[in-house]
Amino acid sequence: TGLPDIMMPVASLADLEKISPDFPALSKLSEKYQVVGVHAFTTDCDDATCHVRNFAPLYDIDEEAATGTSNGALTYYGYLNGFIKAGDDCRFVQGEKMNRPSLILSHIEASGEENGETENGEAENNKASCSIQVGGSAVILAEGDIKL
């Protein structure tokens, strides 16, 4: 999506909710690896593809309520790792811990998917071309005029 994040799988929804980042350390990590931040997620849920939390303190965003670019990237990550399939309509729940629950939607289409084995018998994923769409509803949180 053009904005790199560290994708961080978490075992359970309870573990995701317990995350309490060390924001200065996370800023240093983000700077070191030249990423926007960390996109923590779990597939341990029945109401969505994933529940997620996004942290980007390097950019003065301790936690983000809705992150389309990161969930678009998570869609592809899930596709590469087998928990999202071509043609899936995905639902990502984010912002709950901030009392600003958001639902981000994505859809993935792919062509040229071939799975096989290498000469060593290891799994090989040759995922060719993908198209990912991301969207959702929005609400106005603030309005105003800026005079220059």
What feature does the model see in each segment?
Residues 1-148:
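Active-site proximal loop and beta-alpha junction motif in alpha/beta enzyme cores
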